[in-house]
Amino acid sequence: MSLHFIPLHRRLNFGFVISITLLCILATMTLHAQVPIARLPKPPTPPEQAQWKEHGRTLPTPEARQPVLDAALPAYEPRRDIELSGHFKGAASDVLAILTHQWIAAFQKYYPKVTLDVQPPYAGSLGALELIKGDLQFVMVSRELKPTDVSGFAAKFGYAPFSAPISGGTFRHFGFLDAMGFVVHPDNPLKQLTFDQVDAIYSSTHHRGGKAITTWGQLGLTGEWADKPIHVWGVKPWNGFEEFIRQRALSVGDKRGEWRTDINFTETVFPISPAVAADRYALGYAGLAYIGDNVKLLDIAADASGPAVPLNYDEVIHARYPLCRLVFFNTNKKPGQPLDPVLAEFLKFILSREGQQVILDEAIFIPLRSEQANASRALLAP
């Protein structure tokens, strides 16, 4: 095969340049549309877990394409009316160790007399219980709080812990709060699910008002699929994956959803994608990093009147996909009273353009959209 090079002095055809550019763009779009992975991750080894506990998790390779910071995020305005100072102790989960220290370093440039001290151990199991002991003032957590976290905290203080989203999760990084999806066998003609349907399939409580769904025909499938049972797969409670799905789809207001007892429960999320791939009538959920290319992802609609959104990079970075994950700042804030000025400013900084830029610079987690940051900032009101 011979190769022909275009001399540099020859003028390139404009249409040719445009065609090549479009091909590159389409290639990038295709990369992020075909999100399931061929090689599934393995559970961490004890030495890896020990390393993470002491130093935080090693950051994965960033996505080739990165989000653009929301232009509507407000710039941070340091306080000039008072001089902030003091020593505050916090904790962070292993996936947030590096990001937390980067936030602290950036914040202390504004307030050099403030010390925010976050030391090992770093652990994904951290929650509000660490605040109950009283020796920590804040905890950075990469999951929703456990019910026992909330009830234990409320039993001591008489109110729930303060929990504010401060960052998006990731797109498909293993162990780093990847977006979640529902999957079926490739032969299954189903294309989408609503939260109402998820509740009707998975829960025993049906807080969204629907009747139990047990067959594929009840989801609109016809022919040979109409009377076939749905083989339901999920992660055994308690687990961060099942808690996220439970809170998003099964729980309504202060009504906590409960799982059906006949679900095929697995101890971890790892076996679910392979189980669905091996069963024509199976339905399961998992984080994107745990979903193989031998299953089919379903589009998800938060409600029946809204659009069903595919799990792809664009929908995740713009927080339009309903099962995007979040990172939380947790502390003890008594209702009706302001948060300590230092912690309040730290949170305001994280939610500002400068604070979200720290996330973008790390290139692993996804910055919040302005409406998400505004909602978290509103939680600071007494």
Language-model region placement:
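N-terminal secretory signal peptides that target proteins for export/translocation
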Residues: M1-L12
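A general, composition-driven signal for non-globular sequence regions
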Residues: H4-F5, L26-T28, A97
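Exposed boundary/loop context
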Residues: L8, L26, A277-R280
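Short linear sequence elements within intrinsically disordered, low-complexity coil regions
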Residues: R10, S19-T21, P112, S370
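Bacterial N-terminal signal peptides
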Residues: G15-T28
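Sec/Tat signal peptide C-region and signal peptidase I cleavage site
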Residues: M29-A33
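Flexible loop/hinge segments at secondary-structure junctions
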Residues: Q34-P382
